[in-house]
Curated annotation (Swiss-Prot):
<feature type="compositionally biased region" description="Polar residues">
    <location>
        <begin position="276"/>
        <end position="292"/>
    </location>
</feature>
<feature type="region of interest" description="Disordered">
    <location>
        <begin position="181"/>
        <end position="306"/>
    </location>
</feature>
<dbReference type="InterPro" id="IPR031479">
    <property type="entry name" value="SLX4IP"/>
</dbReference>
<protein>
    <recommendedName>
        <fullName>Protein SLX4IP</fullName>
    </recommendedName>
</protein>
<dbReference type="Pfam" id="PF15744">
    <property type="entry name" value="UPF0492"/>
</dbReference>
<comment type="similarity">
    <text>Belongs to the SLX4IP family.</text>
</comment>
Length: 398
């Protein structure tokens, strides 16, 4: 461990320098006086700022907050040849400087500064120098490396990835078609006695599976078509273009099958609409029949009610006529003398006059005559009403 003393104002900061060996061997010969000077220059600014913060904290205690560099979170700095990690350790013992008269005002800083130095790798240093050189060249020329490349190389780099994706999709489609054909041949060989219907069903199922697998791949393949067109415009060789066209045939076949699927969907929709219209017609016919039955029931009930009312009116009229005839007969037997000569009996005790029995009989008879006349008038009115309603009752109600 090496010890250094760095003067910062009136304070002397003690620095404990630890040099890490290079590689697996414990060789520290790489650290020389030149590296020691470089460490002092790297650490100078941090030490000055720390001394200034210490003085400010003594003048105004509890107001300033400084950043603490500890062993867990050290200060890391890089130089041209080395890299250092530094941190402060508080010293609990006060030290004094025993010096000559000219250094009487010099004090020892209360914190100890520990520095660990390690050599940079040569590759990294070379890379840093090369990067700095390239940056200087680019700044001097005013153009970057991206624009310095030729345009043909850029276009090929852009087109390689989508072209590879398209070729992979084409290979997958061809494999799917080959697998379907092989399965169909195997089915035909294994079951020849089943007939053409079973083989047709198997082929249809296989085709549907292939279409369901190929649809997402087609969507992926449709995206980089622009890149393919640009590649063709750049001038690909003729055999590659022919192979690309030959590989695209399954996608064209699938595109021909797409309108057939659309036609089948339209046919299914038309059938469904026709079924709905038929069901609507049936419901309308049922509603009409139900309404007709209700009307017939109401008409029959109305006829029965009219007949009942007519019968009741006839019976009432007959009973009234019989009563009137009986009252008329009773009046015929009453003598005329009793009707013309009323006799009044005066009571001895009271001064009022009371009608005799013949007078009471006459008053009753007159009342009966009035009732008979009212009955005859009612009979005539009921007969006229019956004559008016008879033709209406004979007709059929709608």
């Amino acid at each position: 461990m090496n010890k250094l003393v760095v003067k910062c104002g009136n304070f002397a900061v003690l620095v404990d320098l630890q040099v890490l060996p290079q590689g697996t061997s414990k060789d520290t010969s790489w650290f020389s006086d030149h590296e020691k000077e470089e460490v002092c220059t790297l650490v100078r600014d941090t030490l000055d700022s720390r001394v200034k913060e210490y003085l400010d904290s003594r003048r105004q205690p509890g107001q300033l907050k400084r950043k603490e560099y500890t062993q867990a979170s050290p200060l890391i700095l890089k130089g041209n040849r080395l890299r250092i990690a530094a941190y402060f350790i508080k010293r609990w013992v006060k030290l004094r400087c025993v010096v000559k008269r000219q250094y009487r005002e010099l004090h020892v800083f209360p914190d100890r500064f520990v520095v660990c130095a390690s050599q940079l790798e040569p590759a990294s240093s070379v890379w840093v120098t090369e990067a700095a050189a390239t940056l200087k060249e680019s700044c001097s020329s005013g153009t970057s490396e991206y624009f310095a490349q030729p345009k043909g190389i850029e276009m090929t780099n852009l087109l390689t990835t989508p072209a590879q994706a398209v070729l992979k999709n084409i290979v997958r489609k061809t494999k799917i078609t080959k697998d379907i054909s092989d399965e169909a041949e195997r089915d035909s060989r294994m079951s020849p006695s089943l007939g053409l219907a079973d083989t047709g069903k198997a082929d249809a199922n296989n085709i549907q599976k292939a279409l369901s697998k190929a649809q997402p791949e087609e969507k992926r393949a449709e995206e980089p078509n622009d890149y393919i067109n640009t590649e063709n415009s750049l001038g690909l060789p003729v055999p590659e273009v022919e192979n690309d066209v030959n590989h695209r045939q399954p996608s064209e076949a699938s595109s021909q099958q797409k309108p057939q699927c659309a036609e089948l969907k339209t046919q299914d929709l038309s059938k469904h609409l026709s079924r709905l219209s038929d069901s609507a017609k049936q419901t309308q016919s049922l509603r009409a029949s139900v309404m007709q039955q209700k009307r017939r029931r109401h008409s029959s009930e109305g006829k029965e009610r009219c007949k009942k009312s007519c019968l009741t009116s006839d019976t009432f009229i007959q009973q009234g006529m019989q009563r009137n005839e009986a009252q008329v007969k009773d009046l015929e037997h009453v003598p005329l003398a009793s009707q013309t000569d009323p006799v009044r009996h005066v009571s001895a005790d009271r001064g009022d006059t009371l009608p005799s029995k013949p007078a009471a009989i006459i008053s009753v008879a007159s009342k009966q005559q009035q009732g008979a006349l009212s009955l005859f008038s009612n009979i005539h009115t009921e007969q006229s009403v019956k004559a008016v309603l008879a033709p209406l009752l004979n007709k059929d109600l709608p």
